[in-house]
Amino acid sequence: LLWGLGHASAQGVDEPMRRQAAALFRDALSAFRPELAGPMESSYALQGLHAYVRAFPGESGPRERLRTAANRLAARLPAGSDWVWPGDRVTYDSGRLPLALLLAAEAVGDDRYREAALRTLRFLERANFPEAKGPLRLIGNSGWWERGRDPAAHDQQPIDASGLVEAYAAAWRATRDPRWLGRAESATA
């Protein structure tokens, strides 16, 4: 909900729509509890918060909620581990998590979020690009990617490709590292 309303607040087709979306966003934000949200719910909410904060930079409340949600999400990522994911299973739309942290880093200028996002994106590369210069291979939903196992190879979700393209493009914007631009291009092929 916050994702859609945040974007509608910033990019709605006309001013009345943007005002209505902003009012609905503020109402929905009052019910958002980062401490109760799962990692993917927080990732989606952070995308909406980012859009809203960019459209309304003078409002401190949404910016602080963004920071709180990003802190909690980044804290869920294991440090010093090969498995850089907040749980034992990677499922669909996994690129949204590093994307959300990259957007949070952009919104509030906190490099900790950027570094956490890049670690997570490198982790996801192991499943999505198992061959260094090979094509994108999405994690299948017929088993997903469980810790200690190979990623499932069948029943991939198209939503995964869009999230990864956005995450790789955001990583390139944040770092100007051509690696990420190359991954974004490969993921669209």
Report the location of each language-model feature:
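Glycan-recognition and catalytic cores of secretory/periplasmic carbohydrate-active enzymes
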Residues: 2-189
